[in-house]
Amino acid sequence: MSRPSLPEPALNAPPQVSAYIDQAFNAFVQSSMPLWVRFADLHVGDRESGELIAFETAFQLHEHWEHVLAHGNPHQHAMTLLRSEIVRWCAEHAITDAMAAHAAFLRAMRATKRQFAVLDESHGVYTAISKLPDRQYLAFVLRHVLGCETAQIARMMNVSEATVNSTVHQARRRLAAHLDQIEKED
């Protein structure tokens, strides 16, 4: 598959500033693209579609790059755009969030079987993960499925590392409680 090239930021800035902003954009996208592709692939279950979603995210980010640099956390802004693009793609392709999450986690769990050996598919772990509150879901997936470091997750979520650790801990507790409840029902 041929990858589209990213446009250069269009600026009304002096050439030196424009060049710096171009370099910052390109460096940011190059360093972020592998994670964006993996995250999108995780949700839609198809790497090629994940790449298209990630590139669309880069194009959208490019449109607001100056504003993002001036006012916001680029990692958080990019993650927001990426998640919006995933939702749009799922709607366009008639894939429900639960179905995409289930397929994605099934693939991710198989790939990291040893890490998740204690979780049994029959106990509805995929459903439980997909039903976590948004912030817990994001932190859990980034850490345990995609293997991101705490500092990287904190930048993407625009929170402290302590908040990331706490959020992941809360997600684990919620999952354990859900799985325990299902076990009692069986």
Question: Which residues does each predicted region cover?
Answer:
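A short, charge-rich alpha-helical start-of-domain segment used by transcription regulators
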Residues: 3-8, 12-38, 48-51, 62
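Short, small-hydrophobic-rich alpha-helical interface motif
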Residues: 36, 40, 50-61, 153, ...
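Acidic, proline/glycine-rich intrinsically disordered inter-domain spacer in sigma factors
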Residues: 15, 100-130
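A short pre-motif secondary-structure segment
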Residues: 139-143
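DNA-recognition helix of helix-turn-helix
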Residues: 83, 151, 157-186
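Σ70-family region 2.3-2.4 aromatic/basic alpha-helix that recognizes the −10 promoter
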Residues: 51-64, 70-106, 172
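C-terminal flanking helix
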Residues: 33, 58, 133, 137, ...
